[in-house]
């Protein structure tokens, strides 16, 4: 084993991380000096809730999102937000400043590999080593999944073996210059990591920041869903469901007076949460992220039924007190700042929740032709989200069932990566692909900034986010997956 020389002080650690490609380096400066050499210390290293998946490089490509007009107008070619919101394919995205999304994904992978590659030689309880490696592999799979779906094409069985993917980092080596793998190879690696680790995970880990078995199976189900293996996705989702099928009843929250009064699902007490991963790491960073990217589009707003508590509990369209983040009269709605507080309610923008497992079960059953089961899973979820009449009738066709599931995914899986990833995978199917049309601005229409119509086609290269130039400079193998 290489001599590591890494120092840390768990949870009060000051990280100064320079990680800009698959062959990058890490420089950690601690407050307290504790050498990582014991099994327990490596195990603690796995739990890192502040993973910081900043969404600015892609989130405004989603038809679920909206933006304050002053953040876009005049910046249509110079910022990620401006380029994405106006679907500007003529802009050069390769010169944009990095928002650290790629860096943070691979920092997390580096952290996992530090455990996987070195814990066998650590001193301490030998029975903890297999668990630690299994947990680290589950999180390593999670970050590779996010990376390949952000920086490469969606998995297409017909082309995945030749489509450019991302670097696979399967061990701890700070000096390696790694090749870029294909999309198929990355998925094979992710699936292998999960299949070999999930049964070793605990049903109830030491704390909420360690992955449990329900998370492992839910992630495996999601990976198989994106891999278009409906039977295996369904089987994994059923195992996750058997371990945790809890849903928060939003009717109870409403009846108790709302989230200001009913705080029993705050912090680590939301039974739906399977993994604690946010867009910016919890705290002021996530608050700003949800303010900046917490505005939903008029289209998504109109998809919520009048009795849908997912809207009435969490959003407002007359948020005059949030004028810095919201354009009144735009037709959009914004996430209530008062609810953006872990002391009131824990909402996962990136991490997995049981609600997503219900939706995976609905989709896989629909894909396999069992519309009755698909309808039942959708209605079980809606029973906890809508007041009054919540049930949908069983659709007559698979297409109608899938259309309903897609709407439920949009209403339930807000922010983070979900809609962006869904658009990419559904755009591979003629029945479900979508051309997004956006008219903008709505409020501040002037001679300088007239209202225009912007269009994003299903095969747009904008759906593949370019690797940051800092990563490409460090690793010549990391060629772009787009022609730009």
Where are these regions (language model features)?
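Membrane-proximal, proline-rich intrinsically disordered regions
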Residues: 22-67, 300-305, 313, 389, ...
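Short, surface-exposed recognition loops and adjoining beta-strand edges that mediate ligand/DNA contacts
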Residues: 32-37, 63-73, 153-162, 203-288, ...
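Extended ligand-binding clefts on enzyme/binding-domain cores
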Residues: 43, 50, 227-228, 234-354, ...
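Conserved, well-structured interaction surfaces
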Residues: 81-151, 181, 199-204, 344-349, ...
């Amino acid at each position: 084993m290489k001599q590591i020389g890494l120092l840390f002080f768990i949870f009060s650690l000051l990280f100064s991380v320079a990680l800009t490609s698959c062959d990058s380096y890490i420089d950690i400066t601690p407050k307290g000096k504790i050498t990582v050499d014991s099994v327990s210390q490596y195990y603690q290293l796995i739990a890192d809730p502040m993973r910081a998946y900043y969404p600015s490089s892609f989130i405004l490509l989603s038809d679920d999102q909206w933006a304050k007009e002053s953040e876009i107008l005049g910046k249509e070619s110079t910022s990620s937000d401006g380029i994405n919101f106006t679907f500007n394919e003529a802009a050069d995205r390769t010169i944009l400043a990095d928002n650290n999304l790629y860096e943070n994904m691979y920092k997390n992978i580096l952290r996992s590999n530090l455990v996987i590659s070195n814990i066998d030689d650590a001193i301490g309880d030998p029975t903890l080593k297999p668990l630690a490696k299994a947990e680290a592999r589950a999180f390593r799979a999670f970050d590779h999944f996010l990376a390949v779906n952000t920086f490469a094409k969606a998995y297409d069985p017909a082309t995945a073996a030749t489509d450019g993917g991302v670097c696979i980092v399967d061990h701890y080596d700070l000096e390696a210059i790694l090749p870029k793998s294909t999309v198929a190879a990355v998925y094979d690696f992710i699936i292998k990591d999960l299949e070999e680790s999930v049964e070793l995970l605990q049903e109830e880990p030491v704390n909420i920041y360690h992955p449990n078995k329900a998370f492992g199976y839910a992630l495996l189900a999601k990976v198989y869903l994106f891999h278009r293996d409906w039977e295996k996705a369904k089987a994994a989702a059923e195992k996750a469901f058997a371990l945790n099928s809890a849903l928060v009843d939003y009717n109870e929250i409403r009846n108790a007076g709302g989230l200001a009064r009913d705080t029993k699902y705050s912090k680590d007490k939301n039974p739906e949460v399977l993994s604690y991963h946010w867009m910016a790491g919890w705290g002021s960073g996530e608050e700003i992220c949800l303010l900046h990217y917490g505005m939903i589009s008029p289209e998504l707003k109109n998809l919520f039924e009048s009795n849908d508590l997912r809207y009435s509990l969490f959003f407002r369209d007359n948020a005059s007190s949030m004028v810095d983040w919201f354009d009144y009269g735009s037709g959009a709605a914004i996430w209530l700042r008062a609810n953006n507080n872990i002391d009131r309610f824990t909402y996962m923008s990136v991490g997995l929740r049981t609600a997503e497992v219900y939706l995976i079960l609905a989709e896989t059953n629909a894909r396999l032709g069992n519309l009755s089961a698909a309808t039942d899973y959708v209605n079980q979820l809606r029973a906890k989200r809508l007041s009054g009449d919540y049930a949908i009738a069983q659709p007559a066709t698979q297409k109608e069932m899938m259309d309903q599931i897609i709407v439920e995914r949009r209403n339930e899986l807000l922010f983070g990566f979900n809609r962006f990833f869904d658009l990419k995978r559904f755009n591979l199917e003629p029945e479900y692909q979508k051309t997004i049309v956006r008219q903008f601005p709505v409020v501040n229409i002037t001679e300088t900034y007239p209202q225009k119509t912007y269009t994003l086609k299903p095969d747009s290269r904008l759906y593949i986010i370019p690797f940051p130039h800092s990563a490409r400079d460090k690793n010549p193998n990391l060629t772009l997956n787009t022609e730009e």
